[in-house]
């Protein structure tokens, strides 16, 4: 039986070898820091390093490879703790930057590496995802057919957004971009959508206001807030949107629905320009490196509606970008407009005139969301967008003088009513029933001559009134169904009973 004993001994040895195998990052490749400064380290001695590879400087200090040269590599640091000097050893890990993901992040405020910022203790991670993950293949995607209610009447009626869409919010500084994005999060308070908000280089006071708004008006237990503070290492700002995308993908890949707000990609582009120039990459237009389009495209392509075979989950992205003096033809805005499925453009002039949200109807568009709009809302809107666009053009023309005829005056009065209806206060998102009711009332002339302030007063109790006095119709609307002709007549009659006495009292 010697052969049997020999075979048993060999199998035991093989099992022992397999047990001793480690699949963790390797730390036996060592390089040397040649130069260090501004959050960037120049390293030699790691000829086999790969882009985005995680490097360890010891004592909990890490960075990742961002640039590869013939005899050196550029490394972006991920933390400011400790000191790194020229001549220090650096080890390649053969791993990549990863973040904790899972339900344990819900209700938490974390940095881009998943470290807690809310004082609630360590995050309970179900697993870890690399910050850079491939976008879903075309065969694994499905058409955008389900609506995302943003709670902003001007968007849900004129430029609807669907689950799995990428819709850019762009405008000058302080025109309400973050307000619209946060309102979209608040509007998910009572549904099944997970919300992730990532702040990139924003002022601490601004981020604190967002956190407090979500805590008091939304459902913080279904939200993840990722904060990359401007005082942190540039590497944290750079990976922030990618890390937040990975956190949202966890839920999408399990058949759930997620909404990601990236605030904002203009600051991320500035960070990418900074670290790229410091690592020696040649500058291009507006000093941005040539790969800036690719960086943002590979990020936003990860947002998608998955097919039923992949679980049917969705990840909707609302990236924010800033313009200067309304210049949409600048490099970063044009890049993002071409990458995304539409854009909500906010106009400084409209904002200063008190039209809030200051959505510019002429240049805003949603390329795929129209198919996802709720059928009842689509039928209620009718020619609203066309009427409003014609009103804006006609109003500008009449400013040159002349006496408008009766027909023109009627068009101007009708357009003024639409404009007043579309005005909305901050952090007061509307539900589907309220939106359908307001649009129906406007389209049937029930709000003609009523000021925006009085419309908001009428709107405040409208939903509760309809649920009490037209419960059957209200239930049909909230379920997304289409009303019959008889139901439409009853609905308009109920609206008239509610609106007319209140409009008269307001007058």
From Swiss-Prot:
UniProt protein name: ATP synthase subunit alpha 2
Function: Produces ATP from ADP in the presence of a proton gradient across the membrane. The alpha chain is a regulatory subunit.
Superkingdom classification of source: Bacteria
Lineage of the species this protein comes from: Bacteria, Pseudomonadati, Pseudomonadota, Alphaproteobacteria, Acetobacterales
Oligomer and partners: F-type ATPases have 2 components, CF(1) - the catalytic core - and CF(0) - the membrane proton channel. CF(1) has five subunits: alpha(3), beta(3), gamma(1), delta(1), epsilon(1). CF(0) has three main subunits: a(1), b(2) and c(9-12). The alpha and beta chains form an alternating ring which encloses part of the gamma chain. CF(1) is attached to CF(0) by a central stalk formed by the gamma and epsilon chains, while a peripheral stalk is formed by the delta and b chains.
Membrane-topology descriptor: Peripheral membrane protein
GO-annotated cellular components: plasma membrane; proton-transporting ATP synthase complex
Catalysed transformations (reactions): ATP + H2O + 4 H(+)(in) = ADP + phosphate + 5 H(+)(out)
InterPro entries cross-referenced by the UniProt entry: ATP_synth_asu-like_sf, ATP_synth_asu_C, ATP_synth_asu_C_sf, ATP_synth_F1_a_nt-bd_dom, ATP_synth_F1_asu, ATPase_a/bsu_AS, ATPase_F1/V1/A1_a/bsu_N, ATPase_F1/V1/A1_a/bsu_N_sf
Positions bound to ATP: 171-178
Gene responsible for this protein: atpA2
TM annotation in the entry: none
Family: Belongs to the ATPase alpha/beta chains family.
A GO MF term: ADP binding
Residue(s) at site: Required for activity: 364
Localization, UniProt: Cell inner membrane
Keywords assigned: ATP synthesis, ATP-binding, Cell inner membrane, Cell membrane, CF(1), Hydrogen ion transport, Ion transport, Membrane, Nucleotide-binding, Translocase, Transport
EC number: 7.1.2.2
SUPFAM superfamilies noted in UniProt: C-terminal domain of alpha and beta subunits of F1 ATP synthase (SSF47917), N-terminal domain of alpha and beta subunits of F1 ATP synthase (SSF50615), P-loop containing nucleoside triphosphate hydrolases (SSF52540)
């Amino acid at each position: 039986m010697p052969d049997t004993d020999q075979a048993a001994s060999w199998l035991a040895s093989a099992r022992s070898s397999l047990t001793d195998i480690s699949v963790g990052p390797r730390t036996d490749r060592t390089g040397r820091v040649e130069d260090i400064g501004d959050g960037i380290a120049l390293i030699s001695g790691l000829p086999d390093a790969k882009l985005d590879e995680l490097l360890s400087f010891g004592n909990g200090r890490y960075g990742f490879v961002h640039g590869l040269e013939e005899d050196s590599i550029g490394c972006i640091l991920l933390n400011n703790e400790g000191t790194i000097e020229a001549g220090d050893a650096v080890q390649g890990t053969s791993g990549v930057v990863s973040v904790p993901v899972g339900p344990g992040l819900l209700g938490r405020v974390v940095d881009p590496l998943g470290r807690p910022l809310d004082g609630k203790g360590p995050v309970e991670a179900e697993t870890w995802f690399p910050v850079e993950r491939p976008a879903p293949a075309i065969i694994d995607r499905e058409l955008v057919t389900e609506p995302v209610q943003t709670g902003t009447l001007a968007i849900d009626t004129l430029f609807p957004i669907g689950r799995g869409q990428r819709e850019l919010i762009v405008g000058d500084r302080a025109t309400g971009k973050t307000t619209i994005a946060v309102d979209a999060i608040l509007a998910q308070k009572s549904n099944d959508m997970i919300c992730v908000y990532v702040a990139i280089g924003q002022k601490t006071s601004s981020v604190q206001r967002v956190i407090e708004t979500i805590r008091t008006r939304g459902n913080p237990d279904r939200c993840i807030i990722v904060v990359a503070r401007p005082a942190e290492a540039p590497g944290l700002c750079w990976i922030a949107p990618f890390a937040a995308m990975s956190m949202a993908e966890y839920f999408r890949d399990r058949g759930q629905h997620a909404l990601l707000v990236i605030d904002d990609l203009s600051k991320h582009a500035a960070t990418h320009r900074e670290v790229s120039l410091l690592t020696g990459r040649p500058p291009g237009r507006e000093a941005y490196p040539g790969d800036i389009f690719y960086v943002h495209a590979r990020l936003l392509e990860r947002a998608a509606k998955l097919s039923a075979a992949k679980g049917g989950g969705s990840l909707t992205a609302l990236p924010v970008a800033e313009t200067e003096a309304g210049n949409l033809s600048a490099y970063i805005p044009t890049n993002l407009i071409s990458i995304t499925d539409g854009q909500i453009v906010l106009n400084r002039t409209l904002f200063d005139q008190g039209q809030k949200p200051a959505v510019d109807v002429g240049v805003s568009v949603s390329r795929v969301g129209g198919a996802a709009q709720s059928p009842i809302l689509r039928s209620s809107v009718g020619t609203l967008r066309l009427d409003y666009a014609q009103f804006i053009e006609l109003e500008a023309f009449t400013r040159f003088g002349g006496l408008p005829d009766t027909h023109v005056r009627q068009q101007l009065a009708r357009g003024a009513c639409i404009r007043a209806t579309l005005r909305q206060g901050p952090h007061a998102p509307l539900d589907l029933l309220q939106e359908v009711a307001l649009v129906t009332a406007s389209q049937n002339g029930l709000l003609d001559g009523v000021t925006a302030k009085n419309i908001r007063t009428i709107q405040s109790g409208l939903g509760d009134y309809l649920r009490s006095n037209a419960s059957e119709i209200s239930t049909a609307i909230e379920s997304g169904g289409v009303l019959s002709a008889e139901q439409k007549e009853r609905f308009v009659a109920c609206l008239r009973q509610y609106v007319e006495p209140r409009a008269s009292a307001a007058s």
